[in-house]
């Protein structure tokens, strides 16, 4: 029947379980579909079909009925879960702070004329692994498809004032970032369920006060946030935005990003930081974005080149990757190189070797890392117990700060993994628009100064790397590679794995290892050519 087909089309995009705000019951898809047939509008549509099938009217009435609201809040102790609420009417739950929170959410949604509501506390049967997996991936889609998202600000009391939202605990949580970002319409409520700052407008996301506070909380402009879409793009920007947000469970640092990146991963609570490792490994494999490797600190249990905590991505433009050279600078430098005594044939060979490299990828927990390798010579400790110095042929004397006792390692290598930078293929951090420094307070000061100067632009030509804006011959392209190779870069410190000499592990450093190719002699060029390879990193 035409009406039932329209109903099935409508509920296909709905969450698996919804709260019927009238009855207070949890209903699955079959019950959601059946509920429409009990409405007077259903019988009116049936009667009207005796003479003419009005498809537009059917679609309008069905879609109007299946509008739903989503809930965004910070989880608390003793939340009403699916296994409890499935047996009882929401409005009959015994008195408690968390029960009252759910009941008020449902009442506000019901009073707004919406029949359906969804809360992550009771609308996900977390005991069903398939259902939990589906929900974590589909959540962004559900928030985007909602008529409104109700945000509950526990701890924000009436009368609320500007700044309360910025300081709220809701604004520190990992899950709430995607919930706010994905929702088209949002309304904020204080903890007594009055409107935040008495903003009696349909959509708080359009309020200048809210826009200003969210920019202050993230350090990023509203327009730039709107430009971000789910998918494996702008990876560094997204990781940066969530890097300071918190989760109760370690695994949720990764699982809360599945929808943002449109990635499906097996959900295994109890795996700890392996979850973040699996997420980052899949992102690196699908995108080839080496900015995922640009961090300093302790590595996780999944792979030594992936961190244990997402907070290491707090810098939008990581100093590990050299800054892009402007076209004017490049023209000046390469013109000088072209007239110098450099061995152009060796430079061309190096350029060819780099171009042949694949993008990095993972096979299980093993990373295939394209890079240029620099072997460290003798290592000695400086006056500081945690600072070591070593000699390398092409990089000169290198200083490394680490808790590790470097002399105990049999051999050590510094690697240059930023091949995309050398070939000008993938600039990092070229889209996010940063709020000017004077417009934000100290709470967003973790955004780097260099990042603040970036402005969003709708002109795709201006986002392209300089070398793609004009055609050059192969020799000029090779000279540009040499120019970039001489820029300071953050190297990764690797050592052969003790149990597998064909593989390597990253050695944790406390600070950035900044190095630079000092001179481009024929001997150095030959060493560089022979040092271009793909390493197995565990």
Language model feature labels by segment:
Residues 1-64, 69, 73-112, 126-130, ...:
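A structural "flexibility-hinge" signal
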Residues 117-125:
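Conserved hydrophobic ligand-interaction patch in extracellular adhesion modules
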């Amino acid at each position: 029947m035409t009406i039932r087909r329209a109903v099935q089309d409508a509920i296909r995009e709905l969450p698996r379980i919804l709260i019927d705000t009238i009855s207070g019951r949890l209903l699955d898809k079959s019950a959601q579909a059946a509920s429409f047939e009990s409405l007077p509008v259903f019988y009116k549509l049936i009667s009207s079909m005796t003479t003419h099938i009005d498809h537009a009217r059917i679609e309008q009435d069905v879609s109007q009925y299946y509008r739903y609201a989503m809930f965004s809040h910070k989880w608390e102790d003793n939340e009403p879960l699916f296994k409890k609420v499935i047996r009882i009417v929401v409005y009959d739950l015994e008195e408690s702070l968390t029960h009252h929170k759910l009941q008020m959410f449902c009442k506000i949604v019901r009073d707004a004329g919406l029949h359906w509501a969804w809360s992550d506390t009771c609308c996900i049967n977390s005991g069903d692994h398939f259902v939990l997996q589906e929900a974590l991936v589909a959540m962004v889609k559900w928030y985007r498809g909602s008529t409104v998202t109700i945000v509950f600000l526990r701890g924000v009391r009436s009368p609320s004032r500007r700044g309360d939202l910025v300081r709220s605990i809701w604004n520190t949580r990992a899950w709430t970032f995607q919930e706010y970002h994905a929702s088209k319409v949002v309304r904020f409520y204080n903890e007594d369920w009055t409107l935040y700052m008495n903003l009696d407008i349909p959509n708080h996301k359009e309020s200048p006060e809210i826009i200003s506070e969210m920019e202050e909380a993230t350090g990023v402009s509203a327009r730039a946030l709107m430009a971000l879409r789910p998918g494996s793009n702008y990876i560094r920007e997204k990781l940066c935005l969530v890097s300071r947000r918190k989760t109760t469970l370690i695994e949720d640092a990764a699982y809360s990003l599945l929808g943002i990146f449109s990635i499906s991963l097996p959900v295994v609570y109890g795996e700890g930081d392996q979850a973040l490792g699996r997420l980052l490994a899949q992102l690196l494999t699908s995108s080839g974005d080496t900015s995922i490797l640009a961090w300093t600190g302790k590595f996780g249990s999944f792979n030594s080149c992936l961190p244990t905590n997402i907070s290491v991505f707090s810098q939008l433009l990581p100093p590990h990757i050299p800054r892009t050279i402007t076209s004017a600078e490049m023209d000046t430098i390469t013109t000088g190189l072209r007239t110098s005594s450099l061995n152009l044939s060796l430079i061309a060979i190096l350029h060819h070797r780099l171009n042949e490299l694949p993008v990095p990828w993972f096979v299980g927990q093993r990373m295939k890392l394209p890079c240029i390798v620099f072997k460290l010579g003798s290592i000695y400790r400086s006056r500081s117990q945690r600072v070591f110095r070593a000699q390398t042929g092409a990089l000169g004397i290198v200083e490394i700060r680490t808790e590790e006792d470097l002399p105990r390692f049999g051999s050590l290598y510094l690697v240059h993994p930023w091949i995309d930078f050398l070939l000008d293929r993938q600039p990092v951090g070229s889209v996010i628009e940063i709020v000017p420094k004077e417009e934000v307070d100290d709470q967003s000061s973790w955004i780097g100064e260099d990042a603040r100067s970036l402005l969003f632009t709708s002109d795709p030509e201006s986002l392209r790397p300089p070398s793609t804006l004009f055609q050059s011959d192969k020799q000029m392209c090779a000279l540009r590679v040499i120019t970039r190779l001489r820029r300071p870069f953050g190297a990764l410190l690797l050592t052969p794995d003790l149990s597998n000499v064909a593989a390597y592990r990253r050695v944790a450093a406390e600070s950035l290892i900044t190095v630079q190719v000092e001179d481009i002699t024929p001997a150095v060029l030959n060493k560089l050519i022979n040092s271009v390879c793909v390493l197995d990193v565990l």
